Amino acid sequence: MAYFLEQTDSEIFELIFEEYKRQNEHLEMIASENYTFASVMEAMGSVLTNKYAEGYPNKRYYGGCEVVDKIESLAIERAKKLFNCQFANVQAHSGSQANNAVYHALLKPYDKILGMDLSCGGHLTHGAKVSLTGKHYQSFSYGVNLDGYIDYEEALKIAQSVKPEIIVCGFSAYPREIDFKKFREIADEVGALLLGDIAHVAGLVVTGEHAHPFPHCHVVSSTTHKTLRGPRGGIILTNDEEIAAKIDKAIFPGTQGGPLMHVIAAKAVGFKENLKPEFKAYAQLVKSNMQVLAKALKEKNHKLVSGGTSNHLLLMDFLDKPYSGKDADIALGNAGITVNKNTIPGETRSPFVTSGIRIGSAALSARGMGAKEFEIIGNKISDILNDINNVSLQLHVKEELKAMVNQFPVYHQPIF
């Protein structure tokens, strides 16, 4: 599958093969990661990577775009059908690029953004001070209650006080559903636009397994990987023609040059996969598997942020533990379970250490694992955390789990 690469750069070839083996042998439980469809990877590795196509279908600055025009148009139409909206821009290189383009389109420098606090589950692009959005705009944040749920009353009070031009509802580490209707009511109360960032839950949204951002949000952004299982990239959606025109200009020429046509083709392929009936069954499995995992951990007396989960991820709370999120990340990694350390509400440790870990079910569900496997995984996670310094136990668990994961290959033939 990679004949030329093996011949011309054996060093990179071997490293890619090493990563292929790692993905096969480890339990991938980082909530933002997934195994993309094999068809998506084939589209990404096509001759489309050779083509520049600045502009939009039938409005290009380069010649020779008659084929890629058809490809991008197909991606747009499939995105509109998938998300049940009237306008879609499929050129954003990433979710962060998509969010920055929305701000560029709809805000002026130093306008006000209200988004979820980073330690409560928000994303860097929702106004974090260290990000571009926190530097180019005035950013404010809302958070969660003591029970770990979004505090909508607090969000309203903050919005009334600061009068933001745009409110962002979305997250990178929040285990519950977003109430888009409530956020729209808050936005209308203060005359703000509402951006729904569904990067994490898009695969659940399009299958009816999570509340839909439309008709409540003025504009919606998402990545195309994560729970959608498409290529790494971003999309922007709206039902407002005026906003759509501004978004297009904000992407090109506002924040990007040439679109990545091989990625746009892969997005189109991914959207077609998402429209199939079996994708709904996958989304249901993602949610049910996470419920099994949460139950197993709670039965072992482990504390979860918000007490559980309503989507594809959960957050473990170590605020009252002698070990940190970083410690847990390393210990579980030694056992072949890949998670990520994560800040949590009430955080007392550094963002590089943290008091929690984030765990997702999307990738292992894509491999076909079900309730039986997730119960086993929950028990093994508990065993590791309850004896966190026992390296021999970690290595023993790794071998046990390797025997299990070998029954669920990532791909049925080498693709790398």
From Swiss-Prot:
Pfam families: SHMT (PF00464)
InterPro entries: PyrdxlP-dep_Trfase, PyrdxlP-dep_Trfase_major, PyrdxlP-dep_Trfase_small, Ser_HO-MeTrfase, Ser_HO-MeTrfase-like, Ser_HO-MeTrfase_PLP_BS, SHMT-like_dom
PROSITE patterns: SHMT
Cofactor (UniProt): pyridoxal 5'-phosphate
The keyword Amino-acid biosynthesis is annotated on this UniProt entry: yes
Residue numbers marked as site, Plays an important role in substrate specificity: 225
Reactions performed catalytically: (6R)-5,10-methylene-5,6,7,8-tetrahydrofolate + glycine + H2O = (6S)-5,6,7,8-tetrahydrofolate + L-serine
Pathway(s) per entry: One-carbon metabolism; tetrahydrofolate interconversion; Amino-acid biosynthesis; glycine biosynthesis; glycine from L-serine: step 1/1
Signal peptide: none
Record-listed N6-(pyridoxal phosphate)lysine modification sites: 226
Keywords: Amino-acid biosynthesis, Cytoplasm, One-carbon metabolism, Pyridoxal phosphate, Transferase
Record's keyword annotation contains DNA-binding: no
A Gene Ontology molecular function term of the record: pyridoxal phosphate binding
Cellular component GO terms held in the UniProt record: cytoplasm; cytosol
Compartment(s) of residence: Cytoplasm
Listed EC numbers: 2.1.2.1
Annotated residues for binding of (6S)-5,6,7,8-tetrahydrofolate: 118, 122-124, 242, 350-352
One GO BP: glycine biosynthetic process from serine
Domain of life of the source: Bacteria
PANTHER family assigned to the protein according to its UniProt record, in alphabetical order: SERINE HYDROXYMETHYLTRANSFERASE
Function per UniProt: Catalyzes the reversible interconversion of serine and glycine with tetrahydrofolate (THF) serving as the one-carbon carrier. This reaction serves as the major source of one-carbon groups required for the biosynthesis of purines, thymidylate, methionine, and other important biomolecules. Also exhibits THF-independent aldolase activity toward beta-hydroxyamino acids, producing glycine and aldehydes, via a retro-aldol mechanism.
Subunit details: Homodimer.
Record-stated family: Belongs to the SHMT family.
Identification of the protein by name: Serine hydroxymethyltransferase
